[in-house]
Amino acid sequence: LISREGFSNIYSNVYHKYPPTSIQEVGEFSEIKLITGEEKHSHKHILTSKIKSGGDCITSRVPLLFNDDLIISKAHVDNSMELPYKNGWADEVLFIHEGVGTLHSNFGNINIKSGDYLVIPRGVIWEIHVEVNMKVLAIESSTPVETPERYRNKFGQLLEHSPFSELSLIHI
């Protein structure tokens, strides 16, 4: 069962073809170092193309901005993920600025390219295999990422005046 907010909210029953019946390995814990700025708030131009990072879609992330609800990072991805990943803390939005690859998840596979947005709810097991090095903007949100209520009916379907429709979304 995958659920964002427990058994009394929206959930998916997921059946594994090869059930993960035991823990194979617990990796090292690597703390994300978030440094609070001491300067007065002002406009900034963050030159993200000059950020030096490398690794997979998780290890190459460099946090840029954060608050109590989210962390915005930039990643220069030059390696495929060796193991599947599950974020139990946050929903993730990945914007593929450059590059090509494939997202593999327990819901299926999807080819990804420059200009794509990926919304990955917390609890989903996923990994990205890189075909062409990627530049990714990653947003981790501790609250669910969903369409605004004003664009949905009571059943969650997008309304006619929504800025996009289900037809413009790729489902896996």
Enumerate the language-model features and the residues they cover:
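An N-terminus-focused feature that recognizes amino-terminal "leader" regions
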Residues: 1-140
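Glycine- and charge-enriched low-complexity intrinsically disordered segments
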Residues: 145-168
